[in-house]
Amino acid sequence: MATQAKRRRVAGPAGSDDDPAPVASFLSWCQRVGLELSPKVAVSRQGTVAGYGMVARESVQPGELLFAVPRAALLSQHTCSISGVLERERGALQSQSGWVPLLLALLHEMQAPASPWSPYFALWPELGRLQHPMFWPEEERRRLLQGTGVPEAVEKDLVNIRSEYYSIVLPFMDAHPDLFSPRVRSLELYRQLVALVMAYSFQEPLEEEEDEKEPNSPLMVPAADILNHLANHNANLEYSPTCLRMVAIQPIPKGHEIFNTYGQMANWQLIHMYGFAEPYPDNTNDTADIQMVTVREAALQGTKVEAERLLLYERWDFLCKLEMVGEEGAFVIGREEVLTEEELATTLKVLCMPAEEFRAFKDQNGWEDDKSEEDSLTITDIPKLKASWRQLLRDSVLLTLQTYATDLKTEQDLLSNKEVYAALSWREQQALQVRYGQKMILHRLLELTR
């Protein structure tokens, strides 16, 4: 979930409030809590791609410290003023997301007049103007993002948020009326804070020897979450026992913005979790999904008699047993690689192999004496696949393209006409970038399977 700084990468419908008071108050707070900002950087709305950001006052070299945040200044379930009660009752706060303790900490601190983090909250985006698709009208979300996987992800989020709020959060607030004012007892506010945590929180990575532990709880990191995102980022967050340090990893010329990144995120993930998409072709981490059940559907289209259909379902059940496929899984295709290489190669192989060969393969529980080159599957390998594999993959791509409301040419026409594109709403532009990036990957697969 949340791992690195989260902020819109491209200019959106943010407010144009240039009031210097929040920044001055925040900088004074930084001094009080020991948050060390390099004199070479400035917090500003000027010269940034979206909202508040950080800009280089002077040239910065790789390895230079941009700022250091002492752990005491982090806002988490462990540092907030109600940490004691959150710890005592942590058993009742268990949830699927794992975010409830932090969200309760935020609900308490944001309504407390004397909260130590008040100057930090002043730099938060306006909660009522968050651009996540969960805040779009359902009809608009489905119309603009049909086929991308986002509407389905949002629906799951909304169900989980509602359940979490009424079964865990509200009962906790009702049990502690002295800690939570009536104005923060709102499902809508809770949804907004979930989106904020999704987009702005950090999650400290586990050490190698801790791999089997539960993931660390999310936390809010003042200053670090001011940075905007760019795939080709020029700064990186480092964790140490006493503080979190943002360090330059590329030369940053004077006047240029400082960017963090939050990993390899496809555009559909960006818009779902953070409310923006990178314009094509900037997002080199973009992907397109082919639902696993779509490949099964494509294979079923090639069956002619009941016996063939029954055998195909037997093959599918065997793939499920091998944990190569699942009813809700997807094969993930990037611009230059198949991210689910083993799963896709094995699925094409099992669904396309002759019946006798499948029987032998099944008897060996999917083990073979020799792993063939066919078991690897890269983008460049696709034209070399067996004809039956290519055909099944092609049919699956065609079925996937049918799930979108528009075709690639429609998207290209919108993107190629600057006046028409500029006239689109912010949401229409972001959704278009998501759809177009996915369709470009899928159409390349059509070329490779021709």
UniProtKB/Swiss-Prot annotation:
The gene is SETD6. The lineage of its organism: Eukaryota, Metazoa, Chordata, Craniata, Vertebrata. S-adenosyl-L-methionine binds at residues 50-52, 200, 228-229, 274. This is N-lysine methyltransferase SETD6. InterPro entries: N-lys_methylase_SETD6, Rubisco_LSMT_subst-bd, Rubisco_LSMT_subst-bd_sf, SET_dom, SET_dom_sf, SETD3_SETD6_MTase, SETD6_SET. It is found in: Nucleus. It catalyses: L-lysyl-[protein] + S-adenosyl-L-methionine = N(6)-methyl-L-lysyl-[protein] + S-adenosyl-L-homocysteine + H(+); L-lysyl(8)-[histone H2AZ] + S-adenosyl-L-methionine = N(6)-methyl-L-lysyl(8)-[histone H2AZ] + S-adenosyl-L-homocysteine + H(+). The keyword RNA-binding does not apply. Its EC number is 2.1.1.-. Residues 39-263 form the SET domain. Residues 1-20 are annotated as: Disordered. It comes from Bos taurus (Bovine). One of its GO terms (biological process) is regulation of inflammatory response. Residues 1-10 have a biased composition (Basic residues). One of its GO terms (cellular component) is nucleus. GO terms for molecular function: protein-lysine N-methyltransferase activity; S-adenosyl-L-methionine binding. It comes from the Eukaryota. Pfam families: Rubis-subs-bind, SET. Automethylated. The keyword Iron does not apply.
